[in-house]
């Protein structure tokens, strides 16, 4: 295995601690605890009382996440009939992508990736010797996803179709009609879909998820960052 340099981190890291205003990162300034209580409506005294009785005993706990947290995560997919048992808590979105790609792809499979995309989506599969096919979004086509090109990139050996929505880094968003078409293409080839939805929910209107369409091989990845 030979992993490529992670370009965005190589570019960001040298200046990250020096910049007064960082326009190259997706993270926002963290709340103070006072701000967090005001935004959530949580009673501060009740929260602190819970903390007093919380055990600090170290144990592995629930390997895939606490039932309470998983139920909360399932709640952000109201149209997808997502249940807590469908949710896996992991160490960040990058870790989730790695688990899916490394866990699903085997020799003889191919991996179809819509690009531009987050670099790990295509470089991890390349690094383990998986044929990685790129469907390139084009500026002259307003970065619209050509469904015919996506279908043409797939065949009987396509195990996984990967995309970001909203797109990272260009911000183009696919809505219900386009996502439904992607699901139908995946069904045609019995392929999994990995949709990195890190920026889903950036506005007040409901933004559809790849898991809204009842396809059991659709995987949504998200994170707090």
Predicted feature descriptions by range:
Residues 139-204:
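Active-site phosphate-binding strand-loop segment of PLP-dependent enzymes
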Residues 115, 131-140:
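Short beta->alpha connector loops at strand-helix junctions that form conserved
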Residues 23-26, 73, 87, 111, ...:
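Generic structural signal for small/hydrophobic residues in well-ordered secondary structure
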Residues 2-92:
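N-terminal small-domain helix-loop-helix segment of the aminotransferase-like
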Residues 109, 130, 188-191, 215-216:
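A short helix->loop->beta-strand "cap" motif at the edges of active sites that frequently abuts
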Residues 206-225:
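Conserved active-site segment immediately N-terminal to the catalytic lysine
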Residues 85, 103-125:
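Conserved PLP-anchoring active-site segment centered on the Schiff-base-forming lysine
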Residues 116, 197-199, 224:
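Short strand-turn motif at the edge of the Rossmann-like AdoMet-binding core
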């Amino acid at each position: 295995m030979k992993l490529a340099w992670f370009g965005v981190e190589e570019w960001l890291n040298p200046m990250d601690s020096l910049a007064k205003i960082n326009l190259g990162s997706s993270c926002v300034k963290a709340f103070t605890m006072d701000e967090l209580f005001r935004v959530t409506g949580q009673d501060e005294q009740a929260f602190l009382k819970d903390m007093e009785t919380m055990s600090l005993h170290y144990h592995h706990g629930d390997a895939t996440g606490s039932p309470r947290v998983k139920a909360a995560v399932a709640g952000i997919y109201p149209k997808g009939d997502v249940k807590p048992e469908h949710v896996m808590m992991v160490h960040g979105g990058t870790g989730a992508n790695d688990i899916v790609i490394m866990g699903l792809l085997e020799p003889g499979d191919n991996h179809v990736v819509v690009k531009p995309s987050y670099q790990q989506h295509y470089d991890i599969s390349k690094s383990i010797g998986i044929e990685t096919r790129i469907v390139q979004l084009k500026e002259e086509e307003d970065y619209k996803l050509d469904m015919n090109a996506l279908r043409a990139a797939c065949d009987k050996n396509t195990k996984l179709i990967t995309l970001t929505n909203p797109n990272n880094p260009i911000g183009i968003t696919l809505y219900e009609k386009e996502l439904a078409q992607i699901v139908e293409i995946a069904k045609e080839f019995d392929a999994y879909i990995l949709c990195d939805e890190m920026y889903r929910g950036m506005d007040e209107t409901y933004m559809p998820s790849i898991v809204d369409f009842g396809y059991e091989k659709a995987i949504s990845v998200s994170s707090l960052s």
